[in-house]
């Protein structure tokens, strides 16, 4: 288990930009819920007949990561919404982002951006290049899948998508 806390001010600008672009482009302007993103996810899921898109914001992901489990149910989504609303009411965006970045798993037992940066690149997270930040960010939706498939075409494609945003 590797975990190292990184204060918001010391987080790489490249990583901040990559994560916002990839996970929640409207993060700074919403109150915890991206209604347009949720509508798009519902539409994509309905059209495909499967759950392919989540529509969760960084705030919602943080609520789930800190307080809930991975189950996919309406009850869990309701709990996530309530926790997200409470967090957004009492916590500023920088702190939410800091908590999120320090709580997500990037690889088996590797938690937080600092630990991930040192694990994958042997450098502090503050020194991540744009390419390195994009590749780390590409892992966020499925870190354990990419742990088992580090050279997958999916990871390369996702990295390129993050770089273009």
UniProtKB/Swiss-Prot annotation:
InterPro entries: Glyco_trans_51, Lysozyme-like_dom_sf, PBP_transglycosylase, Pep_trsgly. It is a single-pass membrane protein. It is found in: Cell inner membrane. Gene3D superfamilies: Biosynthetic peptidoglycan transglycosylase-like. The keyword Transcription does not apply. It catalyses: [GlcNAc-(1->4)-Mur2Ac(oyl-L-Ala-gamma-D-Glu-L-Lys-D-Ala-D-Ala)](n)-di-trans,octa-cis-undecaprenyl diphosphate + beta-D-GlcNAc-(1->4)-Mur2Ac(oyl-L-Ala-gamma-D-Glu-L-Lys-D-Ala-D-Ala)-di-trans,octa-cis-undecaprenyl diphosphate = [GlcNAc-(1->4)-Mur2Ac(oyl-L-Ala-gamma-D-Glu-L-Lys-D-Ala-D-Ala)](n+1)-di-trans,octa-cis-undecaprenyl diphosphate + di-trans,octa-cis-undecaprenyl diphosphate + H(+). Its EC number is 2.4.99.28. GO terms for cellular component: peptidoglycan-based cell wall; plasma membrane. GO terms for biological process: cell wall organization; peptidoglycan biosynthetic process; regulation of cell shape. One of its GO terms (molecular function) is peptidoglycan glycosyltransferase activity. Pathway: Cell wall biogenesis; peptidoglycan biosynthesis. It holds the Pfam family Transgly. Belongs to the glycosyltransferase 51 family. Peptidoglycan polymerase that catalyzes glycan chain elongation from lipid-linked precursors. NCBIfam families: mono_pep_trsgly (TIGR02070). This is Biosynthetic peptidoglycan transglycosylase. The gene is mtgA.
């Amino acid at each position: 288990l590797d975990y190292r806390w990184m204060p918001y001010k010391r987080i790489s600008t490249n990583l901040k930009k990559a994560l916002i672009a990839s996970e929640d482009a409207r993060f700074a302007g919403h109150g915890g819920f991206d209604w347009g993103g949720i509508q798009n996810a519902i539409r994509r899921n309905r059209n495909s007949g499967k759950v392919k898109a989540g529509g969760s914001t960084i705030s919602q992901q943080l609520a789930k990561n800190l307080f809930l489990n991975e189950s996919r149910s309406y009850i869990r989504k309701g709990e996530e919404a309530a926790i997200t609303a409470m967090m957004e009411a009492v916590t500023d965006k920088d702190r939410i982002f800091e908590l999120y970045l320090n709580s997500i798993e990037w690889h088996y037992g590797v938690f937080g951006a600092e630990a991930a940066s040192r694990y994958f690149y042997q450098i502090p997270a503050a020194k991540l290049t744009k390419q390195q930040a994009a590749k780390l960010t590409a892992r966020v939706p499925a870190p354990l899948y990419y742990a088992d498939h580090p050279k997958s075409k999916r990871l390369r494609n996702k990295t390129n998508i993050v770089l273009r945003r």
